[in-house]
């Protein structure tokens, strides 16, 4: 196969991987953590993955501490945690 064909195949495989949903076995453990606003008083609209509802939901983040189940965009949340 030519190098151009290999590059095309590599690009298609990369795209396939990016578009394939995350399965529950591949989901990072932090996706199971509850929403955590943290102790600070900010009002940041962010998203977390809710494993009981199997979807990303919005919550208010205070701006400090909290946990890793905290995403700036719903797209990032879905890409990381949603099955």
UniProtKB/Swiss-Prot annotation:
The keyword Signal applies. The keyword NAD does not apply. Expressed by the venom gland. Keywords: Disulfide bond, Protease inhibitor, Secreted, Serine protease inhibitor, Signal. It comes from the Eukaryota. The record marks 41-42 as: Reactive bond for trypsin. Residues 31-81 form the BPTI/Kunitz inhibitor domain. Residues 1-24 form the signal peptide. Pfam families: Kunitz_BPTI. GO terms for molecular function: serine-type endopeptidase inhibitor activity. It is found in: Secreted. One of its GO terms (cellular component) is extracellular space. Disulfide bonds join 31-81, 40-64, 56-77. Serine protease inhibitor. Belongs to the venom Kunitz-type family. This is Kunitz-type serine protease inhibitor nigrescinin-2. The lineage of its organism: Eukaryota, Metazoa, Chordata, Craniata, Vertebrata.
């Amino acid at each position: 196969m030519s190098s151009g064909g290999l590059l095309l195949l590599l690009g298609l495989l990369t795209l396939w991987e990016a578009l394939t949903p995350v399965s529950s076995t591949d989901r990072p453990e932090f996706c199971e953590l509850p929403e955590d606003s943290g102790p600070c008083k900010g009002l940041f609209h962010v998203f977390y993955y809710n494993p009981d509802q199997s979807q990303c939901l919005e919550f208010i983040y205070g701006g400090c501490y909290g946990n890793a189940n905290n995403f700036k965009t719903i797209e990032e949340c879905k890409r990381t945690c949603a099955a």
